[in-house]
Amino acid sequence: MAIIFNPNKKIFTLQTAHTTYQMQVDRLGYLLHLYYGAKSTCDMDYVLTYADRGFSGNPYAAGMNRTYSLDTLPQEYPTLGTGDFRNIALDIKNEQGTESVELLYKSYEIRDGKYALKGLPAVWASDDEAQTLEIVLGDDIAGVEVHLLYGVLEGCDVITRSVLIKNTGSGNITIEKAHAACLDMVYGDYDVIRFYGKHAMERNLERTHLGHGTLSFGSRRGTSSHQYNPAVILAQRDTTENAGDCYGMLFVYSGNFSCEAEKDQINQTRLLMGLSDELFSYPLAAGETFTVPEVIMSYSADGFSQLSHQYHTCISEHVCRSRFAHEVRPVLINSWEAAYFDFTGDTIVDLAKEAASLGIDMVVMDDGWFGKRDDDNSSLGDWFVNEKKLGGTLSELIDRVHAQGVKFGIWIEPEMVNEDSNLYREHPDWAIQIPGKLPVRSRNQLILDFSRKEVRDNIFDQICAVFDQGKIDYVKWDMNRSMADVYAGNLAYDYVLGVYDFMERLVTRYPDILLEGCSGGGGRFDAGMLYYSPQIWCSDNTDAINRTRIQYGTSFFYPVSSMGAHVSAVPNHQTGRVTSLKTRGITAMAGTFGYELNPALLSDEEKEEIREQIKTFKKYEMLINEGTYWRLTSPFEDEVAAWMSVSRTKDRALVSVVRLYAEANAAACYVKLKGLESDAVYIEENTGRQYTGAALMNAGIPLPFAVKEYEAYQFSFIRLDEAKKLYDEIKKVCGNLKLNEADTADSASDNRIVISIYGGSGSGKTTIAAALQQYFLNDNTACYVLTGDNYPHRIPMRNDEERLNVYNESGEDGLRGYLGTPKEIDFDRINKELSEFKTGKDIIEIKHMGREDGDISYDETDFTGIKVLILEWTHGGSEYLKGVDIPVFLESSPEETKARRIKRGRDENAASPFICRVVELEQEKLDLQGKNARIVVGKDGKVYEQ
C-alpha cells in the first residue's frame, strides 16, 4: 500500500517508489510534519525536538510545558492566530473580524484512486495507480472544518495536495489566505529556484540562497503570468543536475498564486504554495465549501534532472487528458508572422498550397478573421466570420484548405472584448470594471467577466456556431492582457473557475480538435491549462537563441511535448537577430515544431531545407516527445545550449547543440551525454562512428570548431547490440548480390533485395532496422526502411476497436482469424509496393497512415539507386506477404513483449487483459512464422541462419 497509518503512534506514511512522506497527530491533536525525502521504512517521530524558546508561546492545552510551541514545531497546515508567527497556510476571518483558527485532528480516510476536484483541473489516475488520504481537521468554536487531501502516485514519485475548507458554523466567514501545501524542514541550508520573466522572455531560471526571512513571488495579474511561473524548487546548496536533494512544488492553477519560502529564527525552512492572498477575500456562508487548487509535490535525491523526469511523467500521463497527448501532432504553419491582420481567404489558401509543397501538415488562420477586425482595436466579442474579408464562408475556406491536403486551424480569444464591438455596445456591464470607475485598458481591450455564467454561455454559443461550420482540426486559444479592475475579493478565483468551465465544455464538445493554449505566448503556461490543452505556445519570442533559455527553464517542470515552438523568419521579429534556418529548426525541434513565416518569401534552397527539416523532425518526433529529456548544459552559464532525448528503452538518442557565441582561437568544446546504457555500443548515424555509452557520458563528444556564431548541430545515436552481428550474417546471405553496382535494365531486379525484420511488439524492430540501414549506408549501399504500421485497413484506434468488436462477436477463434490476416491488413497494397521495388521501378507511391480518421496518403517516393529495402513489421513473416528475400525473426515471449510495451510507455492499455491476450495470440502466429525465417536473432542475442 502507498499509504500506511500506524494507529499506535498516529503516524501517516505516504510511500512512492523512491520517496517517503510522514506526518503525525500528536498528543494534543495537532498534525505535525515529520519527514519528506528518500524512501524509508522508519517512523520519523524521533526528529521532533522541544526547547523553551523565548517569545514562542505555548498552546493552553500544553499546560506548563514551555517547550511545546507551534512557533517552532514543524506543522502540516499552519494557521493564523495559534502562536505560530511564521508565514501561515490559512487565514480565516469571522463576522466579528477575528482571525484565529486552531485546527485539531478529527478523522481520516484512505481510499484507492485519486481524488478529483469539482470545477478544477487536477492530476488524474486509475484506482490501481494512486491512493488518496483525506485527513479532517477542525475548529468547532470557529465553525471551520478543513479536509487535507493527499494523492499518492507511487510510480511517478509524486504526491498531490489540495484542501477543502468548510464553514460548519452558523455565521459567515471570509477566507483571507488559503495555500494548498506547506512543507516544514527542521534543518538544512537551501537555495530557492524560481522561474521569472516578462512578455517574450519567460521562465528564466534564478537560483537564490534562502537567508533569514521570507523570499516570496507570485502573480496578482489574474493569470499565472509571464513574470513568475507557479513552480518552485527547494534545493540543497550543493545540488546539481545529477546529484543532491531537491523538492519541487507545481501549482495546478492558472490564476493568482503565491509562493513563500522562509528561514526562521532557528534556521528551519518553510515552503508554502497556493492562492495569492492579495486581491483575495472569499466569503463563505454557513454550509458552503471552498476548494484550494492542487499542488504537485516531488522529491529527488539525484538532482534536478530526476526531478524533471518525475514531473514530465506526471504531466504527460496524469495531467494532460487530450487524446493528442501521446499522438503524433501535425507540423503547422501559423499565419500571424506571415500576414498579421492583412490577409484574405485566398491568402490562407495560398499559404496552404505552399505548406503542402513543403510537407507541412496544417495551416492556422490567426487573429483577424472575425467581426471587422483589421487591427487590434475592435471586434473582440463579435465571433462571427468576416465573409467579405475571407471571400466566402468559413466552410468554403476550410474545404479549400483541406483540398490542398493540409489540416485547418483557427485562432480565438474568447475571454476578451473590445469597446468597439457589438457585444460591448449591447452588454457593457459584461466587461470587468470597478463600479463608478473607468477601467484599465490593455492592448485596447477589456476582460469579459467569465465568473458570470450568462457571459460564458453567450461566448460559448458564438464560438460553437463558428466551429460547427466545418471540420476544424486545431484551435489556438489566446489571452492577451492582465486583470486590473478586480471589483471583489472572490472575482479572480471565480473568473479562473469560469475559464475552466468554458474549456471543459469546449473539449467535451470537440474532442477531436487539438487545442493549444496561449497568453501572449507563455503568460499562462501552467499545469492547469495543460489539463485542457496538451500544448501551450511557449513564448511570443521565436528567436532561436532566446528560445534556448526559455525552453531550458520551461523544461524543469514541463515536458517537451507541451512546448509550442516554431521556426520563424529572420531577422527575427522580436530581437532582430539573424540565425541560420538550421539553428532555428534544431531549436524548434525541442518542442511541438512548426513555422511562423511567409514561405512565399523563401528561396528554393530554403524551401528544400525546410522539407528536409520536416522529414528529420518526423523521423525523431516520437523519440523527442515520448523519450526522456536531458539538459546537458545551461544556456545561462555555458557557451553552448545542449539537450538530448533518449528512448525509454535506451536504444536511441538525439542530441542537439546550439552555439551561443563565437570566439577567436576558441578552446575545444565537449558535450557529455546522459541516460545511455554504459556497457552498450552506440553508432552515430551521420558519421558511422561507434562509441560505448560510458564513453559518451564520461568523455563526451567534441563539437566542430565554430565557423560562425549561432551554429547548431544534431547527433543521432542508435544502440547496436545484436544489429552488427545481424548485419554480418545478412551480408553472408546476400554476398552474391552486387549491391554496389549501378542498376541496368537487366540487373535492377537482381540487385535489389527486401529484408523483413519481424517479431513481437516492442521487440526492437525499429531500432535494429535503423542500425542495419546505417551499416548498409556505411558500405555505400543505399537503403530504405519501410514500416508495416502503415498497412492495416484502419487507423490504430479504429483497428483496436475492431479487434474488440471481433472478439465480442466471435470470441477468441474469431479474433485469431482476424489478427494479421487480410481482414486486418492490406497485404495487396504492400505486396504491390514490394513488387514494384523488386522489378526496378524508381518512383513508387508509398502508403502513409496517421492516427486520425481519414489521415491516409500515398506519397511518391524516389527509389533511384536504392538497393536494399528493410521492412520492419510485426507481420514481416506472414504467409500473405510476398517478395521478401531475407526474413529475419526476433525471438521473444509474450511476457517480454508485454514488459517492453509497458516500458516503452506508448500504449495506454498495454497491461490490460484484452491487450495481453492479443499479444499472446500474435505471439502464437509469430512462433509459427519464425520457422520460416532465414535468420533468427535469439532471446540471448545470438544470431544464426536457419
Regions found by a protein language model. Give the residues of each.
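Small-molecule kinase domains that catalyze NTP-dependent phosphoryl transfer to phosphate-bearing small molecules
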Residues: 906-946
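C-terminal beta-strand-rich structural cap/linker in extracellular carbohydrate-active enzymes
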Residues: 693-722
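Conserved nucleotide-sensing/catalytic segment adjacent to the nucleotide-binding pocket
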Residues: 784, 793-852
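Carbohydrate-binding surface patches
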Residues: 241, 634-677
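ATP-dependent NMP and nucleoside kinases share a basic, alpha-helical "lid"
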Residues: 856-904
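Active-site neighborhood of glycoside hydrolase catalytic domains
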Residues: 389-393, 425-582, 592-597, 601
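Aromatic-lined carbohydrate-binding/catalytic grooves of carbohydrate-active enzymes
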Residues: 324-461, 474
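Polysaccharide-binding surfaces and accessory modules of carbohydrate-active proteins
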Residues: 5, 10-13, 17, 21, ...
